[in-house]
Regions:
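Membrane-embedded alpha-helical bundles of multi-pass enzymes
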Residues: 1-130
Length: 130
């Protein structure tokens, strides 16, 4: 459990600097700890929910680290932005996790990339104003 917590935290820490204007290089390996957590679970409903929890923790931490500045405008803003961004991230990642347990790995990774690009596109062209 502590290894998974450390991996979720490490993943969030590696993904954050690119959005904070520091460096984007850490994003290249930012998903590796989260993918390790996913690979450590077998298929099944209980394990799906466990992975959901670790992924949600990772994405909530990542989003909280990158959109904290919205607090300057309104206290409700960062909470709403974190929930909305986390939901979009979770759609793509949990689709990957589900397919990786039931189908070919190549299809799962293709869906992760395609799903992530689709949710980022939706996020970019949507009416999100943060």
């Amino acid at each position: 459990m502590y290894r998974r917590f450390a991996a979720a935290l490490l993943s969030a820490l590696l993904l954050s600097p690119g959005w904070l204007g520091m460096t984007g290089f850490t994003q290249l390996i930012g998903f590796v700890p989260l993918l390790w957590i996913s690979s450590s679970y077998e298929g099944g409903r209980r394990n799906w929910w466990r992975m959901f929890g670790w992924a949600a923790l990772t994405f909530v931490l990542w989003n909280a680290m990158t959109i904290w500045w919205i607090w300057n405008a309104t206290p409700v803003g960062p909470v709403a932005a974190t929930l909305a961004s986390t939901t979009l991230n979770m759609i793509a990642f949990m689709l990957f996790h589900t397919v990786s347990k039931k189908g070919p790995k190549a299809l799962a990774y293709t869906l992760l990339v395609a799903g992530w690009i689709a949710t980022e596109y939706w996020y970019t062209v949507g009416e999100f104003s943060w």
